[in-house]
Design a protein with these regions (language model features):
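Transmembrane helix-loop-helix hairpins at membrane boundaries of multipass inner-membrane proteins
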Residues: 1-10, 16-107, 182-191, 484, ...
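Alpha-helical transmembrane segments
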Residues: 17-22, 89-90, 438, 523-533, ...
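Hydrophobic alpha-helical membrane-insertion segments
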Residues: 36-48, 166-172, 376-388, 465-484, ...
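Membrane-interfacial helical/loop segments at transmembrane boundaries in membrane proteins
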Residues: 58-62, 187-188, 397-411, 482-507
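Hydrophobic alpha-helical transmembrane segments
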Residues: 70-82, 197-208, 412-428, 502-524
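Hydrophobic transmembrane alpha-helices and their helix-loop junctions in integral membrane proteins
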Residues: 87-98, 103, 107-128, 138-458, ...
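Aromatic-capped, Gly/Pro-kinked transmembrane alpha-helices
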Residues: 483-513, 531-652
């Protein structure tokens, strides 16, 4: 047994022991520490496999298992799980103190993380599906343990309903592939009719796409993530949706090959929709965690753009371009895992101190919580794609891959690549717009309520993880080639050219980017501005003049005011609603209440009609529950007759 295999086994055992210790009286902090250490060891094992480019354990089998193993792709996702989950579990040591059901939440969190590990190391359909279901149920348990409010229960109900939808597709695809022997014989599926391959591809896209949060199957995500404890939100958004993408990568690039021709265009269309619509809906949100959840939809769309571009480039015979697009998708998978978990953890710290995440009630937190605020600023720059942070590197590579696809991808690739590149460019601009708003409302400006003014920095166990994640975002952004090298070997189309992996990222025929030089330039400009400001001296303070009114935080920019121009321009798409209620005392206006919202059109036009139809059908089916023994015996006899008839037809 190899060293990496031993490290993986020891890590899983230590994490399991940590789950048990978490529920022991006064064992919460020790249990979470053991969980974090064990998960970190599994990540080390995954990194060893990626660097060594050699798998350990079993290969995928068509049997009923259980079998486990790690190849470089699994190793990459193991390392990513550890980089997100270890800081989240350390953060939970401070976050869960004083909360109700803290030991049970800690145990559910540990089970959740181990289920993520289990999915990526599973090497048979049954083990994969068992871990998949455990991964789906564990966060729901943690959410309900943290809160039993009506909104939380409704969010969990939507999440579990979407999980069932995803499960149907995943179970159908996995069990059918095992039945056909496609896990061991990669040519077995090629002999099947096109209809069978199309049905399996559709099941995989629906199943894994729903769990990943691709539009239009994303409705659970902006409900469940804000309802979860912040360390669970960090792992859900940081890694659970990425594990769904892991399953999609296995399906599209390995098990279902060769794919039907419609798969790549459909995936690219869903990805472009997720990018643009995700960031638009994020801009319209007033609650921080819900805003971050919609940005998860956006970034999953960016990853899916890279995967779709890889498929289209491979179909056009451009294998080097396909390798670049695949590597860009994997790099953004890692980058989003880091900066999104960072942002959710910072949001949890803000909520712990202030008691709300309403953007219009925050402000000035950079002064009262400087460490968390600085880390949040770093995460905001990363998710907005601002250099020198990691989000820019992967988005730049994805954009270059799409531009190259538009130039060299053949008739289909040219049109689709151009549309996708335009969608990504628009998404990047809107993301910057969104986080200018977020940073201004959350970190800067005056305190909007007394709780913000009285807030202070959280404990070391909560600041340490966010500083660590912010450092990773900066490090990968400055030297992305160090990470891109091992990631490049994950591509099924061969490694990236060596010229693309140095200090300067080079895309042959497209462009180059020197992140270290950009970082040095930004640092130099910052120092120069500080020196110039110091030499200029400070301005004399003067009272604010606002036409005789007393200065008040309500006069500052609001979340809705910041995006009003965009709402007006896109009103035909967003369909904003506004109500104004005026309370009169005789002829004197006593109060004016203004309410506005941007409805979620996917819910109103797609899911609510489906739900209403299902409920109507359920009411009809309830009529069969008559309470009559004779009726139930009749149902049994009819069912038995149908089964026997089907069996008879099958035998003949």
């Amino acid at each position: 047994m190899t060293t990496s295999a031993w490290v993986l086994i020891v890590g899983a055992a230590v994490a399991t022991a940590g789950i048990a210790v978490s529920v022991v009286p006064r064992g919460l902090r020790a249990g979470l520490a053991l969980q974090a250490f064990g998960v970190a060891l599994t990540g080390v094992a995954g990194a060893m496999v990626v660097i060594g480019a050699a798998g350990v354990g079993s290969q995928f089998s068509n049997g009923l298992g259980p079998t486990v193993g790690v190849d470089p792709l699994s190793g990459f996702f193991l390392a990513a799980i550890a980089l997100v989950s270890t800081p989240a579990l350390v953060y939970a040591r401070g976050y869960l103190l004083g909360s109700h059901h803290a030991p049970a939440i800690a145990a559910a969190s540990g089970v959740f993380v181990l289920a993520l590990v289990g999915v990526v190391v599973a090497r048979d359909a049954v083990t994969f599906l068992v871990m998949w279901e455990l991964m789906s149920v564990a966060p729901a348990v943690a959410i309900l343990l943290a809160s039993r409010s009506a909104d939380t229960c409704r969010a969990v109900l939507v999440y579990l309903g979407s999980t069932h939808l995803a499960g149907v597709g995943v179970w159908l695809a996995m069990l059918t592939l095992a039945h056909l022997g496609a896990f061991t014989d990669l040519h077995a599926l090629a002999a099947q009719p096109t209809l069978v391959r199309s049905l399996l591809a559709g099941a995989a896209l629906v199943g894994f796409g729903t769990k990943a949060g691709l539009m239009p199957l994303h409705s659970w995500l902006p409900r469940a993530h804000p309802a979860a404890p912040s360390h669970v939100s960090a792992v859900m958004s940081g890694m659970m949706i990425k594990v769904a993408l892991y399953g999609l990568v296995r399906m599209l690039f390995e098990w279902l090959a060769p794919l039907p021709g419609w798969v790549a265009p459909v995936l690219l269309g869903a990805a472009a929709l997720s990018c643009v619509a995700g960031v638009l809906y994020a801009l319209m949100q007033h609650e921080l965690k819900r805003l971050l959840a919609f940005h998860s939809v956006e970034n999953v769309g960016i990853i899916a753009l890279g995967l779709a571009a890889a498929l289209l480039a491979a179909d056009a015979g451009q294998l080097q371009l396909a390798a670049l697009a695949f590597a860009a998708a994997m790099l953004h998978t890692l980058n989003h895992a880091l900066f999104k978990s960072l942002l959710f953890l910072c949001a949890g710290s803000f909520q712990r101190q202030v008691g709300t995440l309403d953007l219009d009630r925050l402000g000035g937190l950079l002064r009262t919580m400087p460490l968390t605020g600085t880390a949040f600023l770093a995460g905001s720059m990363a998710i907005a794609g601002v250099p020198p942070f990691n989000g820019f590197a992967s988005e730049w590579l994805t954009l270059q891959a799409l531009v190259q696809l538009a130039l060299h991808g053949g008739p289909a690739g040219t049109a689709l690549g151009a549309l996708a590149a335009a969608a990504l460019a628009a998404t990047a601009a809107l993301a910057v717009f969104c986080f200018v708003k977020v940073v201004g409302l959350v970190l800067l400006g005056a305190h909007r309520q007394k709780a913000v003014a009285n807030s202070h920095e959280v404990s070391v166990s909560m600041t340490g993880p966010v500083i660590f994640l912010a450092g990773l975002c900066l490090a990968i952004g400055v030297v992305p080639g160090v990470v891109l090298g091992p990631i490049g070997h994950l591509s099924p189309y061969g490694p990236l050219p060596a010229s693309a992996l140095g200090i300067t990222l080079v895309v042959p025929g497209s462009g180059a980017f020197a992140p270290l030089a950009v970082a040095a330039f930004i640092a130099g400009c910052t120092v120069a501005l500080r020196l110039a400001r110091r030499q200029a001296g400070s301005a004399a303070p003067s009272p604010m003049w606002i036409c005789g009114q007393v200065p008040d935080s309500r006069l500052a920019w609001s979340s809705a005011g910041f995006t009003k121009s965009l709402r007006l321009v896109l009103a035909i798409v967003l369909r904003p609603r506004r109500t104004v209620s005026i309370e009169l005392d005789g002829v004197v206006v006593h109060s004016v209440v203004h309410e506005s919202e941007v409805p979620h059109l996917f819910d109103e036009l797609l899911f609510r009609p489906v739900v209403r139809g299902v409920l109507a059908a359920s009411r009809l089916l309830r009529r069969t529950q008559s309470g009559s023994l004779r009726a139930y015996l009749t149902y049994l006899l009819v069912t038995l007759a149908v089964v026997l008839a089907v069996a008879r037809i099958g035998v003949s």
